[in-house]
Design a protein with these regions (language model features):
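Conserved, structured core segments of small domains
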Residues: 1-146
Length: 146
């Protein structure tokens, strides 16, 4: 199963504030080692950190209208500061990996959320076979860089 693992933003991460230099370098080294473990285990599919929401945009959909909303966005607890995309055998395996993760924001309470990705089989018979084949072709093309 594939899961998205999201590091929730904090007030400091939203303000672009990093820990002191020494502590930040240790965090980066620890995260690097953790990511290496994920790669060696065949779990890591993708990972990245995100800039604060002040650098982002949202597009609100209302019928046929699209409205662009400039960041920053006020609800810090709903914002994501970074993510991993993992291939794991179960939610329990994902939880065990997250428990091994270095604290993403040393010195403050932080949270990591794990969400399974919706896979074609989750839609059952509602997903036409030709759409499933189409999805698979797109995934292969994307992986090949086309």
């Amino acid at each position: 199963m594939r899961v998205m693992v999201m590091v929730k933003a904090t007030k400091d991460s939203e303000e672009g504030i990093h820990p002191e230099k020494e502590e930040f370098q240790k965090l980066l080294a620890d995260m690097g080692k953790f990511n290496e473990e994920l790669v060696k285990a065949g779990v890591l599919l993708a990972a990245d950190g995100l800039k604060p929401s002040s650098k982002g945009k949202r597009v609100r959909f209302s019928s046929t209208e699209r409205t662009v909303i400039d960041g920053p966005f006020s609800e810090t607890k709903e914002l994501v500061a970074g993510f991993w995309l993992w291939q794991v055998k179960s939610m329990e395996e994902a939880i065990e990996w997250v428990k091994r993760c270095p604290c993403p924001f040393p010195g403050v309470e932080s949270e990591i959320e794990i969400r399974p990705l919706a896979e074609p089989e989750d839609f059952g018979e509602a997903l036409a076979p030709e759409f499933k084949e189409y999805e698979e072709r797109l995934r292969v093309q994307a992986a090949a860089g086309n």
